[in-house]
């Protein structure tokens, strides 16, 4: 009977439940071994079968087979008797008994059925042998070997009995065959159920096997190691028992040493806790010192500023002293002069008193009295100023005394702090020396040579003690590392103390310097007091000089202020002048270009004026010729009235033709018809009329075309209006650019118009040339020919000349207006370009300032983000440190519990035989997953017998590393490598940082 299965331990199972289950499994295994202890060969047989891979069920089946085959093997081949037949029949098992045995056997039902069938065939074989014996006897009887009747009767009775037995055996065989079939069906059903259960069980095993395979491998390795150690331990058991008696005293010594070492470890832990608390206090004290250092830095900064202010005040006071010394010298000179004047005035008074009849004595007396009153008032003012100076001197001396007392108190406080730090340093050094001495003692105790061991192997108690000693050595090494870290921290603290001592020395030097300055100031004040007597004598005579000095000082201050204002104004004006010079250079370039264009235009205008003068001279000639022709035309009034009316109608029709093309064509046809009729009527004047009409058509058509072009070209002058909704500079720049573009377009259009006007003037000149030549020819023609010229042609010429003259004047006036407009537009363009340049410069300055401010803002944001990141990192490190400390405390508590258990129960060491049972129990606790052969697995390496030592716990090293990182943040690549603005920050309740930049 195998021990019951135990489920594998859960990963979250506690240590106590695991130990209780292990104890229960060990008890059950011991009971099982006690039960199976008498049947040792059976156990060996089971071990062999386990090794060969067979199950115990097969052993039971083989036992059943051997038990049933025994009677068949021992039956004799002789013909049996009735008793033997009955015995044989009794040997055959009944089906009910077979069923009960199959149900009791469980897994060996198939083997039992095989034994049943085997026994029935054996019985049939025996019956056939008996029948063959009877047949052989009958044949012998037939051959002559006669028998008696009694034998025959016996044989017959025997035969009858055998027949009855055959019938009964036949019936029993049928029953057995039916029962065998039923059992086969049941066996098949049970086999199917078993296969299903096996499949389910295999699936469960496959699921559980993956999780438990690693544990099984570990247990297999440990079992192999223990099996390999079992023989050695059994052989060494006697030796160890003898050695145990010898080493009982040694174990007691070791126990006493362990107790002393534990006490020492407890003391070391206490000292370490005290050192850690002292270190925390030192860290807090360092933080307080850093805060005080920052406050002292601020105070030093403020004191430096106050020093600078005081130095400036000292320099001002020295200058005032120099001025006062100069005033004193001048006052002494003035006093001497005034004494001389007084003597002279006294002499004059005596003279005036002696000469009472003198007329101007009263006036001189009044002047002397006025001068005396002025001197007295001046003396009063000087006394008041002296009192004010004394009050200021007293206040300054009191301030100096208060500052010197404050600095002395600060120096005393810093000296006391330095003294306290020195005492703490000495205490820590003494503690470190004591710890080092205790460590040296422990090392000497650990390094003492152990007593010679017997040839037999060490006991488990000694191994455990050695393991505990090694663990204690490791803990001592950890404590030594912590002590070294503490020593390093103490060295860093001593270094900080040295730095603070140096700073204190610097502060003391500054205080001495201040005291020396105070002494110098006292000397200056004493000298001022000594000079006070002399100044008080000269105060009565220094009023006028002081007033002059005050006036001069006021004038000097005014001049300095004016000079500063003038210099600032000059700088601004120089900047403006530079900009204006640059703009003037650009404007001069533009003006040069415009001057060139204006010169070209002026040359063109001069050419046009010359053409105008020529045209006017021609027109005057035309007017003279016209007056000559008028005298000739007066005679032809009666005959030419109708023609004149027709010409007027014709001119009107020509005007309509110019404005309306279609009507003009019809009117032209009508005029041509009327002209043809008139030509028929006036054959004499037809040639002259045709010439005049041709000239009029040449003169009138371009003039009217020009009128139309003028009407078409009369465009309203664009007025430059600045909108009121311009707020931003960008909109102003866009508006200026648009206005400049419009002005350039208008300038181009005006240039095109000028070119067209020039072309028109040229065409008019070309038109006027033939008219002028004709007039000159007509002037040369005699009066007789002039009589032939019609009056209507002269009138038409006169009208054409008037139109031409008016058109020329209008063209010139338009040209002048266009020039003025061009100049205005150029002026507007210059102004707009200047404004755009200034706006562009302002925009560039604004962008530069904005970029600088943005860069500073980005730097501040980066610095704040770095500080926040450092703060988060410190929080994470503190959390890690807390977790590591808790872990270290838990581990130490566990080790202390183990040590206490070992020290309280040093003799409760288990024997080597129960260790094997323990391992078997642990193996059985994991579950009967597969059968392991334990008989032949006795060949593992001897080096694997020892249990591997536990790994070092790195929590203490991590704690020390985190403490170093927290104490020395400069080791991390942070803000120390980058230059930054010094400022102090403090997080409030909402974790918001308020920054005070210095």
Swiss-Prot record:
Stretches for region Interaction with GORASP1/GRASP65: 988-998
Signal peptide (from-to): none
Subcellular location(s) of the protein: Golgi apparatus, cis-Golgi network membrane; Endoplasmic reticulum-Golgi intermediate compartment membrane; Cytoplasm, Cytoskeleton, Spindle pole
Biased composition (Polar residues): 58-69, 271-280
Residue ranges of coiled coil: 147-894
Compositional bias ranges of the Pro residues kind: 1-11, 448-457
Record-listed Phosphoserine modification sites: 37, 66, 273, 438, 697, 933, 977
Region (Disordered): 1-81, 246-288, 443-468
The entry's keywords: Cell cycle, Cell division, Coiled coil, Cytoplasm, Cytoskeleton, Golgi apparatus, Membrane, Methylation, Microtubule, Mitosis, Phosphoprotein, Protein transport, Transport
Effect of residue 94 to A: Does not affect interaction with p115/USO1
Free-text note on domains in this protein's UniProt record: Extended rod-like protein with long coiled-coil domains. The nuclear localization signal (cNLS) mediates interaction with importin-alpha, recruiting importin-alpha to the Golgi membrane and liberating TPX2.
Function: Peripheral membrane component of the cis-Golgi stack that acts as a membrane skeleton that maintains the structure of the Golgi apparatus, and as a vesicle thether that facilitates vesicle fusion to the Golgi membrane. Required for normal protein transport from the endoplasmic reticulum to the Golgi apparatus and the cell membrane. Together with p115/USO1 and STX5, involved in vesicle tethering and fusion at the cis-Golgi membrane to maintain the stacked and inter-connected structure of the Golgi apparatus.
The protein's name in its UniProt record: Golgin subfamily A member 2
Organism: Rattus norvegicus (Rat)
Species classification: Eukaryota, Metazoa, Chordata, Craniata, Vertebrata
Name of the encoding gene: Golga2
């Amino acid at each position: 009977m195998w021990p019951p299965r135990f489920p594998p331990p859960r990963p979250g199972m506690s240590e106590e439940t695991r130990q209780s289950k292990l104890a229960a499994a060990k008890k059950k295994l011991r009971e099982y071994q006690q039960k199976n202890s008498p049947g040792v060969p059976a156990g060996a047989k089971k071990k062999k079968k386990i090794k060969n891979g067979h199950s115990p069920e097969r052993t039971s089946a083989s036992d059943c087979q051997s038990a049933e085959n025994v009677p068949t093997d021992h039956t004799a081949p002789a013909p049996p008797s009735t008793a033997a037949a009955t015995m044989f029949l009794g040997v055959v098992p009944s089906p009910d008994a077979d069923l009960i045995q199959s149900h009791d056997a469980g897994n060996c039902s198939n083997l039992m059925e095989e034994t049943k069938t085997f026994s029935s065939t054996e019985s049939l074989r025996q019956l056939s042998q008996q029948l063959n014996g009877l047949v052989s006897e009958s044949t012998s009887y037939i051959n002559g070997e006669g028998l008696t009747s009694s034998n025959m009767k016996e044989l017959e009775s025997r035969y009858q009995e055998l027949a009855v037995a055959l019938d009964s055996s036949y019936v029993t065989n049928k029953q057995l065959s039916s029962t065998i079939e039923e059992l086969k069906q049941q066996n098949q059903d049970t086999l199917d159920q078993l296969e299903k259960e096996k499949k389910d069980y295999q699936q469960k095993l496959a699921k559980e096997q993956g999780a438990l395979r690693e544990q099984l491998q570990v247990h297999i390795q440990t079992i192999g190691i223990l099996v390999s150690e079992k023989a050695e331990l059994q052989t060494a058991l006697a030796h160890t028992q003898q050695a145990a008696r010898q080493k009982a005293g040694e174990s007691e010594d070791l126990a006493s040493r362990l107790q002393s070492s534990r006490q020492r470890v407890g003391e070391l832990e206490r000292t370490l806790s005290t050192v850690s608390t002292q270190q925390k206090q030192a860290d807090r004290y360092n933080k307080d010192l850093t805060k005080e250092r920052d406050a002292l830095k601020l105070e030093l900064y403020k004191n430096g500023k106050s020093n600078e202010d005081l130095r400036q005040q000292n320099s001002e006071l020295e200058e005032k002293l120099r001025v006062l010394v100069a005033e004193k010298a001048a006052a002494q000179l003035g006093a001497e002069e005034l004494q001389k004047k007084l003597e002279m005035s006294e002499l004059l008074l005596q003279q005036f008193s002696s000469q009472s009849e003198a007329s101007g004595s009263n006036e001189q007396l009044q002047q002397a009295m006025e001068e005396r009153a002025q001197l007295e008032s001046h003396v009063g003012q000087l006394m008041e100023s002296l009192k004010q100076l004394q009050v200021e001197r007293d206040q300054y001396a009191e301030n100096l005394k208060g500052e010197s007392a404050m600095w002395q108190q600060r120096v005393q406080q810093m000296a006391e702090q330095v003294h306290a730090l020195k005492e703490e340093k000495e205490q820590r050094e003494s503690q470190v020396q004591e710890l080092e001495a205790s460590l040296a003692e422990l090392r000497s105790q650990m390094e003492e040579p152990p007593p010679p061991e017997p040839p037999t192997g060490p006991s488990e108690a000694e191994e455990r003690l050695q393991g505990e000693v090694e663990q204690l050595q490791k803990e001592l090494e950890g404590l030594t590392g912590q002590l070294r870290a503490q020593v390093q921290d103490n060295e860093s603290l001593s270094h900080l103390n040295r730095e603070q001592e140096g700073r204190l020395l610097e502060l003391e030097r500054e205080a001495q310097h201040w005291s020396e300055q105070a002494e110098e100031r006292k000397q200056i004040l004493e000298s001022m007091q000594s000079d006070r007597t002399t100044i008080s004598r000269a105060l009565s005579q220094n009023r006028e000089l002081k007033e002059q000095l005050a006036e001069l000082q006021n004038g000097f201050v005014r001049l300095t202020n004016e000079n500063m204002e003038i210099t600032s104004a000059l700088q601004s004006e120089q900047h403006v002048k530079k900009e204006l010079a640059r703009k003037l250079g650009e404007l001069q370039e533009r003006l040069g270009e415009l001057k060139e264009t204006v010169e070209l235009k002026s040359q063109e205008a001069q050419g046009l004026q010359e053409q105008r003068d020529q045209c006017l001279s021609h027109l005057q000639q035309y007017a003279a010729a016209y007056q000559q022709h008028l005298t000739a035309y007066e005679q032809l009034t009666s005959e030419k009235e109708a023609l004149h009316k027709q010409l007027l109608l014709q001119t009107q029709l020509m005007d309509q033709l110019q404005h309306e093309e279609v009507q003009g064509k019809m009117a032209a046809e009508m005029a041509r018809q009327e002209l043809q009729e008139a030509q028929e009527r006036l054959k004499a004047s037809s040639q002259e009329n045709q010439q005049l009409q041709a000239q009029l058509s040449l003169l009138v058509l371009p003039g009217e075309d020009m009128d139309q072009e003028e009407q078409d070209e009369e465009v309203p002058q664009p007025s430059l209006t600045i909108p009121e909704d311009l707020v931003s500079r960008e909109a102003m720049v866009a508006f200026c650019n648009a206005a400049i573009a419009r002005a350039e377009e208008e300038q181009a259009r005006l240039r095109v118009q000028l070119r067209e006007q020039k072309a028109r003037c040229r065409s008019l000149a070309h038109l006027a040339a033939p008219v002028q030549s004709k007039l000159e020819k007509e002037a040369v023609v005699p009066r007789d020919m002039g009589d032939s010229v019609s009056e209507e042609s002269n009138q038409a010429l006169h009208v054409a000349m008037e139109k031409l003259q008016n058109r020329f004047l209008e063209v010139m006036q338009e040209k002048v207006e266009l020039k003025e407009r061009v100049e205005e537009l150029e002026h507007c363009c210059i102004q707009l370009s200047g404004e755009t340049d200034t706006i562009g410069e302002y925009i560039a300055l604004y962008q530069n300032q904005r970029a600088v401010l943005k860069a500073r803002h980005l730097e501040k944001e980066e610095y704040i983000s770095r500080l926040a990141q450092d703060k988060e990192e410190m929080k994470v490190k503190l959390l890690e440190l807390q977790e590591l400390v808790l872990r270290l405390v838990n581990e130490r508590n566990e080790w202390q519990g183990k040590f206490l258990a070992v020290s309280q129960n040093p003799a409760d060491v288990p024997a080597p035989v129960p260790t094997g049972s323990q391992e078997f129990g642990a193996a059985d606790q994991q579950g009967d997953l597969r059968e392991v052969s334990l008989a032949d697995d006795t060949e593992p390496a001897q080096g694997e017998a020892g249990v591997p030592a536990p790994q070092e716990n790195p929590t203490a090293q991590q704690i020390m590393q985190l403490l170093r990182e927290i104490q020395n943040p400069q080791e991390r690549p942070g803000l120390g490598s980058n230059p930054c603005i010094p400022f102090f920050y403090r997080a409030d309740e909402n974790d918001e940082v308020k920054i005070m930049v210095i």
